[in-house]
Amino acid sequence: MSLLQSLLHLTNFKSPLLRTLVPAVSAAYAIQAAFALPSIFAQNERFYDFSGSLTYLSVTALSLYLPALRAKYTPTVANASTSLPSLLAPFTSPGGMGALNWRQVVLSGAVIFWAVRLGSYLFQRILEEGKDSRFDEIKKSPARFAGAFFAQATWVSLCLMPVIALNAVPASAFAALPAFKASDALGLLVYVAGFAFEITADRQKSRWLRERREKAHDEQFMTSGLWSVSQYPNYFGEISLWTGIATAAAGTLVSQPIQVALGLSGGVTGPLTVMALSYVSPAFVSFLLLKVSGVPLSEKKYDKRYGDRKDYQEWKKNTPKLFPKIF
């Protein structure tokens, strides 16, 4: 029996949800541990954000293909000739035996697009700047630095909960659902809007920083573009896109046939469970950005630098912290 078959056998729980959830979360912590060891030894944070993006990509792909891998390699049903399902099949010939559902492909793709875009942006930024000031003190302590990687594995796992749960649904269960639901449209619309907002904010900030390095302006803090309507427009975009993913996933997971297929109990427990699995993602992102590592760290830094400046005080007073000022 190969190592892969052994791992599949070890995680072959009765519950379809656990059969996908446990290996996916375990993979997140394993990947982070693999990057943590050399980073701690070298006291170097250069690959921290890159490892986060790679973990998102790997865990998403694993959760999407895990049912097919089980069908291919589990000893009781092993069939080496079984090929992995096509990502295009849900759109060209939906409903095939063992085929993925279009919702699984689209939401997994949404995560992958986001992870590639943000990961490349952050990796390019640290290559240009040479370091990440967040880790100036943390990387000196092996325990604290290891904790940062552990926290990142937790971040990935919680953010991906709605996608992991959706990808755990057996293919046959989707036949009981309509081809398209209002929650699909709403969730994808919120995701696209949030993704566009985050991209625009990051590009505006990158251009502003580049122009400042080139002496095109002497502004000390950014108040133009999306920063004129929100103090943290990139965070607003990120919270929004994860809310969109959660909404689209929850609209499917809350259906009774899907809950039965996942092995969840009836009554109110099933809907509450899938709603919690879905919305823990944007809830955790909001908590992390607004209360832990995002806004508090940035605000402390900028208040210390510019807190005595009248223009900075006016900008903080007149600009919403998160939700954009539309009018």
Regions found by a protein language model. Name each.
Residues 114-131:
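Active-site neighborhood of divalent metal-dependent phosphoester bond hydrolases
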Residues 2-32, 56-67, 71-118, 159-204, ...:
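Hydrophobic transmembrane alpha-helices
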Residues 144-156, 231-238:
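Select subsegments of transmembrane alpha-helices in polytopic membrane proteins
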Residues 12-15, 36-46:
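Short, hydrophobic transmembrane alpha-helix segments
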Residues 207-209:
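Membrane-interface helix/loop boundary segments of multi-pass membrane proteins
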Residues 45-60:
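Loop-to-helix transition at the N-terminal end of transmembrane alpha-helices
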Residues 132-142:
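Short membrane-interface loop/juxtamembrane segments of multi-pass integral membrane proteins
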